[in-house]
Amino acid sequence: MKVILKEDFTNLGREGDTVEVKDGFARNYLLPKGFAVFSNKHNVEIFNQKKRSILKKQETKKQIANDLKSKLDLVKLEFFMKSNDSGKLFHSINSLNIAEELLKLGFDIERKKIDIHHGTLKAFGTYDVTVKLYEGISAIIKVEIKKEKKQEDKKSLNKKLNKVDE
């Protein structure tokens, strides 16, 4: 069945594209949710008239993605994690943790757009994480996982500081 997309779809096409999809996918998902319309003469004419505004909207999205990329490329996130004596982390870092930290910095990035090459980060070190922004535009942010100081270390440090103050 041929349909005209009303939104961009990652593996299907862009807004305004006429694509061939299976009947069930169109009837049960795309059409009821309003993501597409039937491809008939009337709808094709409507989308041909809207083509200019669709292209302008795509250019705007691309420009916003490029601006965001230039800002995100400068971001370095630091996580302080607890570990056992052998150095193994108690918790791993996933895309949700990264999205929350980016939100604290003012970047509202969907979790599904964050691509951790290894799935989750489970060891100390510095990692490159890809953030997909738009078609062909992605930013790379640095994520560093450091060892969190133990309570005992903090207490001994506070005692040393108190002795220096006296």
UniProtKB/Swiss-Prot annotation:
Taxonomically, which superkingdom? Bacteria
Q: Which GO terms describe its molecular function?
A: rRNA binding; structural constituent of ribosome
The record's Gene Ontology biological-process terms are:
translation
Q: Which PANTHER family match?
A: 50S RIBOSOMAL PROTEIN L9 (PTHR21368)
Could you tell me what this protein does? Binds to the 23S rRNA.
Q: Identify this protein by name.
A: Large ribosomal subunit protein bL9
**Keyword line:** Ribonucleoprotein, Ribosomal protein, RNA-binding, rRNA-binding
Q: Give the family, as the similarity comment puts it.
A: Belongs to the bacterial ribosomal protein bL9 family.
Question: What Gene3D superfamilies does this protein map onto?
Answer: Ribosomal protein L9, C-terminal domain, Ribosomal protein L9, N-terminal domain
Per the record, its GO cellular-component terms are: ribonucleoprotein complex; ribosome
Pfam families xref list: Ribosomal_L9_C, Ribosomal_L9_N
Q: NCBIfam families under this entry?
A: L9
Give the classification, highest ranks.
Answer: Bacteria, Pseudomonadati, Spirochaetota, Spirochaetia, Spirochaetales
Which InterPro entries does the entry link to?
A: Ribosomal_bL9, Ribosomal_bL9/RNase_H1_N, Ribosomal_bL9_bac/chp, Ribosomal_bL9_C, Ribosomal_bL9_C_sf, Ribosomal_bL9_N, Ribosomal_bL9_N_sf
